[in-house]
Regions:
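C-terminal-of-GTPase-core extension/linker across diverse P-loop GTPases
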Residues: 1-52
Length: 52
């Protein structure tokens, strides 16, 4: 399980999470899309900068 803050210009990552992971929560905020999800470790390694 991870909590991520995805910038709007990388919104395609949310679609990836929907298709490849388990999306638990999604919240559109001023600074990006907050996502709580179950994703694989390779995804987290690649996107460490998005973890909150």
């Amino acid at each position: 399980k991870a909590e991520l803050l995805i910038p709007y210009n990388e919104g395609g990552l949310v679609n990836y999470i929907r298709e490849e992971g388990i999306l638990i929560k999604e919240d559109y905020r001023a600074d990006g899309i907050y996502v709580k999800a179950v994703v694989d470790i390779q995804f987290l390694d690649k996107h460490k900068d998005l973890i909150v």
